[in-house]
C-alpha cells in the first residue's frame, strides 16, 4: 500500500526524523487560513499523487509569498499530472501539500528496502540526492553504497566516511536518521522507505525534504492506523474491487484479458502473449481456492476494461480443481453474455472433467491443451 508524501512525513516525524513543517490543502481558501502557521519567507507547494516525477511535470512549485502559494494551489487542484510513473493518462491532483522552504547546503539519497536475494532490509545511500536513483546507478554507480544489515548488525557508518569523505558530525547525523527510519520500517511493516532528497541545511541539520513509504499489504491487518491513510482515489478501481474477492489484479495497457492461477504462471502467460505479438490487458491471479463466484467476479473485473478484446484463461489444477473452474467459467459466461473471444486452457487436477463441462456448455469457448497453442489462438482471434 502506498501513501502520500505528507502522510509519509507524518509517520517519519513520529520516529524522530526531522521534516519541514507544512499542511495539506484541498482548496486555495485553506491556504489563506493556514499559511500563517508556517514561519518561512518562501513556501514549497507540492501536488500529492501516488507517483514520482512531480517536479518535472509541474507538480512542485516554489512560492515567494503566501499569495503566490495560494495561486499555485488553485492552479494545481483538479489538474491532471502526467509523469513517467503515471502513464499517459496521468493522475488527478486532489490534494496539495504546502511546507516551509529550506536552506539547502547539500542533497543526499537514503532509502531502506527489502533485498529479495538476501531476504532482509538493506540501506541504500547516495551523495546524489534529488535525482532518479536508477539514473545515478546507471551513470555514476560509484556514488551509491548499499548497507547489508540484519538484526545483529548495526549501521556500518564507515562506508560513508570511506566513500563520501563526510565529517564525523555529518556521519553521526546521517546514522541517526538511518536508525530512526529503520525503527519506522520495522514498526510499521513497511516494504520501502525512501528519503529523496535527504537535505543537509545551511545550519548543519538533516531533514527529509521528500519522503515515500510503501507498506506490506500482507501485514496491513496488524495496522488499522495505517489502513486509515489509504487513499482509494489514487488506486485503480478494478484493483480495489479485486481485493474484495481475494484476487490479485494489476491493470495493464493491452487488449487480451488474462485469468490465471498462480503468480508465476500468470507472468509466463503474459510473456507468451507478448511473444506472439499482442499485449496483455491485465495480471489476474485467482489463487488456489477460487470458487464459481470468484471466477464470475474475475470475469466482471476483466471485462470492466473497455480495452479488452479477448480473454485467455490458463489454469493448472493443483489445489484448484479444473472442473470447478470450468463450471465457474460456464456460469460466468452465461450470466454475463460474454461477447469477446474466450480461449480456455485447463491442465492438472480433473482437467478432463473440466474440458467436458466446457464442451457440453453449448457456449462458444475455444479450448486449448498447451499454453503456446492457447496464446496463438487468442492472439489470432483478437487480431
From Swiss-Prot:
<dbReference type="InterPro" id="IPR013650">
    <property type="entry name" value="ATP-grasp_succ-CoA_synth-type"/>
</dbReference>
<dbReference type="InterPro" id="IPR011761">
    <property type="entry name" value="ATP-grasp"/>
</dbReference>
<dbReference type="GO" id="GO:0004775">
    <property type="term" value="F:succinate-CoA ligase (ADP-forming) activity"/>
</dbReference>
<dbReference type="GO" id="GO:0004776">
    <property type="term" value="F:succinate-CoA ligase (GDP-forming) activity"/>
</dbReference>
<comment type="similarity">
    <text>Belongs to the succinate/malate CoA ligase beta subunit family.</text>
</comment>
<feature type="binding site">
    <location>
        <position position="210"/>
    </location>
    <ligand>
        <name>Mg(2+)</name>
    </ligand>
</feature>
<dbReference type="GO" id="GO:0006104">
    <property type="term" value="P:succinyl-CoA metabolic process"/>
</dbReference>
<feature type="binding site">
    <location>
        <position position="99"/>
    </location>
    <ligand>
        <name>ATP</name>
    </ligand>
</feature>
<dbReference type="GO" id="GO:0000287">
    <property type="term" value="F:magnesium ion binding"/>
</dbReference>
<comment type="function">
    <text>Succinyl-CoA synthetase functions in the citric acid cycle (TCA), coupling the hydrolysis of succinyl-CoA to the synthesis of either ATP or GTP and thus represents the only step of substrate-level phosphorylation in the TCA. The beta subunit provides nucleotide specificity of the enzyme and binds the substrate succinate, while the binding sites for coenzyme A and phosphate are found in the alpha subunit.</text>
</comment>
<dbReference type="InterPro" id="IPR017866">
    <property type="entry name" value="Succ-CoA_synthase_bsu_CS"/>
</dbReference>
<dbReference type="Pfam" id="PF08442">
    <property type="entry name" value="ATP-grasp_2"/>
</dbReference>
<comment type="pathway">
    <text>Carbohydrate metabolism; tricarboxylic acid cycle; succinate from succinyl-CoA (ligase route): step 1/1.</text>
</comment>
<feature type="binding site">
    <location>
        <position position="107"/>
    </location>
    <ligand>
        <name>ATP</name>
    </ligand>
</feature>
<dbReference type="InterPro" id="IPR013815">
    <property type="entry name" value="ATP_grasp_subdomain_1"/>
</dbReference>
<feature type="binding site">
    <location>
        <position position="196"/>
    </location>
    <ligand>
        <name>Mg(2+)</name>
    </ligand>
</feature>
<dbReference type="GO" id="GO:0006099">
    <property type="term" value="P:tricarboxylic acid cycle"/>
</dbReference>
<keyword id="KW-0547">Nucleotide-binding</keyword>
<dbReference type="GO" id="GO:0005829">
    <property type="term" value="C:cytosol"/>
</dbReference>
<feature type="binding site">
    <location>
        <position position="102"/>
    </location>
    <ligand>
        <name>ATP</name>
    </ligand>
</feature>
<keyword id="KW-0816">Tricarboxylic acid cycle</keyword>
<dbReference type="GO" id="GO:0042709">
    <property type="term" value="C:succinate-CoA ligase complex"/>
</dbReference>
<feature type="binding site">
    <location>
        <begin position="318"/>
        <end position="320"/>
    </location>
    <ligand>
        <name>substrate</name>
    </ligand>
</feature>
<dbReference type="Pfam" id="PF00549">
    <property type="entry name" value="Ligase_CoA"/>
</dbReference>
<feature type="binding site">
    <location>
        <begin position="53"/>
        <end position="55"/>
    </location>
    <ligand>
        <name>ATP</name>
    </ligand>
</feature>
<keyword id="KW-0479">Metal-binding</keyword>
<keyword id="KW-0067">ATP-binding</keyword>
<feature type="domain" description="ATP-grasp">
    <location>
        <begin position="9"/>
        <end position="241"/>
    </location>
</feature>
<keyword id="KW-0460">Magnesium</keyword>
<keyword id="KW-0436">Ligase</keyword>
<dbReference type="InterPro" id="IPR016102">
    <property type="entry name" value="Succinyl-CoA_synth-like"/>
</dbReference>
<feature type="binding site">
    <location>
        <position position="46"/>
    </location>
    <ligand>
        <name>ATP</name>
    </ligand>
</feature>
<comment type="subunit">
    <text>Heterotetramer of two alpha and two beta subunits.</text>
</comment>
<feature type="binding site">
    <location>
        <position position="261"/>
    </location>
    <ligand>
        <name>substrate</name>
    </ligand>
</feature>
<protein>
    <recommendedName>
        <fullName>Succinate--CoA ligase [ADP-forming] subunit beta</fullName>
        <ecNumber>6.2.1.5</ecNumber>
    </recommendedName>
</protein>
<dbReference type="InterPro" id="IPR005811">
    <property type="entry name" value="SUCC_ACL_C"/>
</dbReference>
<dbReference type="GO" id="GO:0005524">
    <property type="term" value="F:ATP binding"/>
</dbReference>
<dbReference type="InterPro" id="IPR005809">
    <property type="entry name" value="Succ_CoA_ligase-like_bsu"/>
</dbReference>
